[in-house]
């Protein structure tokens, strides 16, 4: 089997995508951000999906148990690996690769199954932006530090909260209408807007906290 043959193109592309995401995540961490957290923040509409086949599919893929970016990388990685292995098996048996019109759907099917079971195994070991030490509702009334560049009403940025157990949580915070948060601001979380977004105000006790 020739790894870089044309019949392996879609699978090599998928593996390259995983490597690219890894590089982008490293770059984002160097800049003080979390690419996975940013993606999850833009998936608030998942919270409104409570019934139907879409909800079942998302649950099967462990969306919610794992960060969305991790699920995406698992999908791409397994698809690339399974596709290459299937084509290799075909060459070993029939001395010729099969058409990707057949191999791609089969690879997708095995990929979905692999992601489901792998996700269930690794989910307890994946660090999330929240912890079981306190619930998300308990963030309200806590002080946080703005770590993103800038936030305005409707356009949140990342903030860092350290709970009473010393654990760090990264949240998306935004100010009230007409206010602006900038990097380094200390803010008070006052209410929850969605699964990942919170409303905050500037530190009302700057002389104390």
Swiss-Prot record:
GO cellular component term of the entry, any: plasma membrane
| Residues spanning the membrane | 12-32, 66-86, 102-122
Ranges in the topological domain labelled Periplasmic: 1-11, 87-101
> Which residues face the membrane's Cytoplasmic side?
33-65, 123-209
Q: How does it sit in the membrane?
A: Multi-pass membrane protein
Q: Where in the cell is it found?
A: Cell inner membrane
Highest taxon of the lineage: Bacteria
**Pfam families according to UniProt:** YqiJ_N (PF21001), YqiJ_OB (PF07290)
Q: What is this protein called?
A: Inner membrane protein YqiJ
Its encoding gene is what? yqiJ
């Amino acid at each position: 089997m020739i790894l870089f043959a044309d019949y392996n193109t879609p699978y090599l592309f998928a593996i390259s995508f995983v490597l690219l995401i890894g590089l982008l995540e490293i770059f984002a961490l160097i800049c003080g951000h979390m690419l996975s957290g940013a993606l999850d923040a833009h998936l608030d509409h998942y919270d409104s999906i409570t019934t139907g086949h879409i909800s079942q599919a998302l649950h099967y893929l462990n969306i919610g148990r794992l960060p969305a970016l991790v699920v995406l990388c698992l999908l791409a990685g397994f698809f690339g690996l399974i596709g290459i292995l299937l084509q290799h098996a075909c060459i070993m048996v029939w001395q010729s690769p099969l058409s990707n019109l057949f191999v791609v759907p089969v690879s997708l099917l095995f990929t979905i199954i692999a992601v489901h079971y792998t996700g269930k195994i690794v989910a307890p070991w994946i660090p999330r932006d929240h912890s079981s030490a306190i619930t998300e509702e308990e963030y309200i009334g806590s002080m946080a530090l703005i770590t993103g560049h800038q936030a305005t009403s409707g356009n949140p940025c990342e903030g860092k909260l350290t709970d009473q157990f010393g654990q760090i949580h990264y949240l998306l915070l935004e100010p009230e209408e007409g206010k602006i948060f900038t990097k380094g601001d200390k803010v008070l979380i006052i209410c929850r807007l969605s699964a990942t977004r919170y409303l905050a105000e500037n530190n009302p006790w700057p002389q104390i906290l």
